Amino acid sequence: SIDQKLALIASRGNIKGLKGFCPVALRDSRLLVDARPEFSSSYKSMNYQFASLENKLKFDREPAKYAPAAGGSDIVTLVDKQDDQEGTLDFASWYKGRLYLFSSKTNMNVFMKTPALYVGVE
């Protein structure tokens, strides 16, 4: 359930970004699956870890499909304040197949009201 997923995300505390979950499992199945350090790749200066070799290879073929928008930075602070703040899965939204991470619930809500102002900023 959504409540169970939110509780699992919250249990990771103040960890930012994807909080140790596999981005491929998140994107393809909307599942929170633990990533493993032995399966990792870099994309746009960011390191990502995956639950399996299969997921790593999927990511390597199409990294832009699986990596969070703006490398996981809060796109609202990037656009509105030219400030690069790391987002977190605690405040996340799917929009047109891309995962957006935010540093606060307020910024997530701003994005959801007017996503066209922010989409495409990388």
Task: Describe every region a protein language model picked out.
Residues 1-122:
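Charged, low-complexity intrinsically disordered segments
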